[in-house]
Amino acid sequence: MNYTESSPLRESTAIGFTPELESIIPVPSNKTTCENWREIHHLVFHVANICFAVGLVIPTTLHLHMIFLRGMLTLGCTLYIVWATLYRCALDIMIWNSVFLGVNILHLSYLLYKKRPVKIEKELSGMYRRLFEPLRVPPDLFRRLTGQFCMIQTLKKGQTYAAEDKTSVDDRLSILLKGKMKVSYRGHFLHNIYPCAFIDSPEFRSTQMHKGEKFQVTIIADDNCRFLCWSRERLTYFLESEPFLYEIFRYLIGKDITNKLYSLNDPTLNDKKAKKLEHQLSLCTQISMLEMRNSIASSSDSDDGLHQFLRGTSSMSSLHVSSPHQRASAKMKPIEEGAEDDDDVFEPASPNTLKVHQLP
């Protein structure tokens, strides 16, 4: 009888009661020791590992990095299954790689679905290329924006979009898609609105601070017009859930207000000139256009301010802004030549003011 098979010490060691006695028990040689290396595996096995290696070294800066990675892993798992089935006859290797293959195929399908070309309506494609694509708004996000709580409406020539002191500014926000509109105040022309421009961006900015206001201008279709119209309330809720798109709208509305300010100062500004001004952003974007439109009438009792504004802008081809340095303070006297003492510039606040002179 073999000693290692009948010894009670061997049985207790196998059970785990006396592991400290293992050092004195002779251990048979390991039959699985790689004394003779087997032959190299089939070429399919090596190609599968090459696919794994290529997928792992793809740089993350590549645009389609994840798609290429999942594609190489899918190919590698497929080759592993072929090798395990035809050349190795290993059921466990085939099963595990089948699971990995399924996971990679699902993830690859999802990535391809996300990268699918999003079809934008032909009528909205011009607006997307002009306004949103330069700001890197994804097509799927633009489609969500234009596919919910908005509609395309039509106005015939001469029809009114907004009436002065009658139409509420809290209902909608619109972008002109086709045609031309003109804006007037008390029957006097102010400026035009061209395609891919907001119709009521000044009112949208003003209603963020004050609710329940009315249009202070009249907007009439000067041609057959089509425009995209959002519900103001639902658009606000949607932008709150999309911070990126919220900032995009702030920028676009600010730029549109700037263009309208240029148009107010130059009524001859046409669509081609307006396009050249799109890149010129200034502090005017922070001014409420509603206040700008109202400022042309300094008093509700007379139209002197309006006529003065119209006379000043009829022949104006560029902006003329008075320098703030030309405004004299009420507490300052004119500085005469040769005045060297700063105390002579300002009037004394009171006759009892004590002057302190520095000793030489």
Curated annotation (Swiss-Prot):
Glycans are attached at N2, N30. Residues 93-115 are annotated as: Required for interaction with CAV3. The chain crosses the membrane at residues 49-69, 71-91, 93-113. Residues 317-360 are annotated as: Disordered. GO terms for cellular component: bicellular tight junction; caveola; cell junction; cell projection membrane; lateral plasma membrane; membrane; plasma membrane; sarcolemma. It is linked to Muscular dystrophy, limb-girdle, autosomal recessive 25: An autosomal recessive muscular disorder characterized by slowly progressive onset of proximal lower limb weakness in adulthood, syncopal episodes, and markedly increased serum creatine kinase, which can increase further after strenuous exercise. Homodimer. Homodimerization requires the C-terminus cytoplasmic region. Interacts (via the C-terminus cytoplasmic tail) with TJP1. Interacts (via the C-terminus cytoplasmic tail) with ARHGEF25/GEFT (via the DH domain). Interacts (via the C-terminus cytoplasmic tail) with VAMP3. Interacts with KCNK2; the interaction enhances KCNK2 surface expression and is inhibited by cAMP. Interacts with CAV3. This is Popeye domain-containing protein 1. It comes from Homo sapiens (Human).
